[in-house]
């Protein structure tokens, strides 16, 4: 057996294919998977493809945190709501008309964002702007119907084949409160609103529970083996008491539905995790993905391993994005960093080597190839570096 290695290269690929700067050995229209084959290791199929949409329906509801992209196991349907879409240059204004009022949001996807490899539009105007908006957004979610879409997932799974784990996307937020934080308000405004309008926020969470319940049931019954729920956990933004009180109960609830069915819960833990290390083992998650160590965060992989071992949580990640940038690490520094990382990974159990969070657009491509060589050379399990 060998240490699993699944590098995330979508941001790098999107940017370089858009700019026409893919490495010379690849033809102009080489696919992401063709380049992944060249690098070696497994396919990274965790965060979904938000760019190659089948129709505008796939991501038009980005402003309310609802997606219908490839690889998902469910499809959300707006009920009793009229959606009006208006293009304004590089922005898209989306208005939701309900019997009790209307709300709107604005999505921005610029040429610079495309050149930078960004795959998800930026929410430049959030859906909650005043206290009355809470009830309107609550109406949207309380009446939303969620339908199984297992054929969509199975098509995705077939395309991945045996080259990686086809993770199905559940939701980018781990709970209703986390959903409000990530999609309905900017982070600063969210905390002001928690203080200024706790009743409205609590009622909105209650209105969103049926939506999460529907998703959880469908995910638990899905053919997927690994389910993605929740991203961007961070000790500052989702500080420990917030994570414990407002996110963990929903992670534990879904985990309790998945584990009896032999399924695993994956969370995208790409932030500063130091303050959350004691909570993650209790959260129900089986895989902490995009775990990022020093120098981009305050933790070492050794510290993360020691903490997460208590909950038998698998670590997925370890190579920080800056390790691929020549202006951040020289070749000599890169070699030193990677050798030290392999020493920390020993003996290699419950570890999937990956990029935290993703390979940057200006990465030195040869370093991806070099890591694959290191895995071949030093990754035999149990590792004895």
Regions found by a protein language model. Name each.
Residues 6, 20, 37-38, 50, ...:
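Generic detection of intrinsically disordered/low-complexity segments and helix-coil linkers/edges
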Residues 1-26, 30, 106, 127-385:
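Active-site loop segments of alpha/beta catalytic cores
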Residues 18-76:
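Segments that shape or occlude catalytic/ligand-binding pockets
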Residues 36-37, 97, 305:
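Residue-level preference for well-ordered alpha-helical positions
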Residues 16, 59-61, 67, 76, ...:
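Compositionally biased, low-complexity repeat tracts
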Residues 42-43, 55, 66, 95, ...:
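Intrinsically disordered, low-complexity N-terminal regions enriched in serine/proline/glycine
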Residues 4-9, 43-55, 71-121, 145-184, ...:
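Glycine-rich, aromatic-flanked loop segments that form ligand/cofactor-binding clefts
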């Amino acid at each position: 057996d060998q240490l699993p290695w699944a590098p995330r290269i979508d941001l790098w690929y999107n940017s370089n294919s858009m700019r026409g700067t893919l490495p010379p050995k690849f033809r102009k229209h080489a696919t992401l998977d063709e380049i992944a084959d060249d690098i070696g290791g497994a396919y990274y199929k965790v965060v979904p493809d938000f760019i190659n949409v089948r129709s505008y329906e796939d991501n038009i509801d980005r402003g309310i945190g609802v997606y219908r992209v490839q690889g998902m196991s469910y499809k959300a349907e707006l009920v009793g709501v009229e959606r009006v879409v208006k293009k304004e240059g590089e922005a898209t204004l989306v208005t939701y008309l309900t019997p009790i009022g209307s709300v709107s949001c604005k999505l921005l996807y610029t040429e610079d964002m495309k050149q930078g490899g960004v795959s998800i539009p930026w929410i430049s105007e959030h859906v909650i702007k005043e206290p009355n908006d809470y009830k309107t957004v609550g109406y949207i979610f309380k009446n939303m119907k969620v339908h199984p879409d297992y054929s969509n997932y199975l098509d995705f799974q077939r395309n991945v084949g045996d080259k990686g784990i086809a993770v199905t996307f559940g939701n980018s937020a781990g709970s209703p409160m986390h959903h409000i934080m990530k999609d309905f308000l900017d982070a600063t405004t969210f905390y002001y609103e928690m203080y200024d309008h706790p009743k409205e926020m609590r009622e909105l969470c209650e209105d969103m529970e049926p939506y999460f319940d529907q998703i959880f049931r469908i995910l638990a019954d899905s053919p997927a083996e690994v389910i993605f729920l929740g991203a961007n956990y961070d000790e500052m933004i989702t500080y420990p008491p917030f994570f414990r009180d407002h996110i963990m109960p929903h992670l534990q609830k879904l985990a309790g539905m998945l584990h009896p069915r032999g399924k695993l819960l994956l969370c995208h833990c790409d932030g500063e995790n130091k303050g959350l290390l004691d909570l993650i083992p209790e959260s129900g998650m089986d895989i902490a993905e995009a775990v990022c160590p020093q120098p981009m965060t305050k933790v070492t992989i050794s510290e993360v391993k020691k903490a997460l071992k208590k909950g038998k949580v698998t670590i997925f990640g370890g190579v920080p994005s800056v390790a691929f940038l020549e202006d951040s690490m020289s070749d000599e520094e890169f070699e030193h960093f990677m050798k030290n990382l392999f020493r920390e990974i020993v003996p290699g159990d419950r570890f999937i080597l990956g990029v935290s969070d993703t390979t940057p657009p200006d990465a030195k491509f040869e370093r991806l190839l070099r890591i694959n060589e290191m895995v071949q050379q030093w990754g035999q399990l149990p590792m004895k570096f």
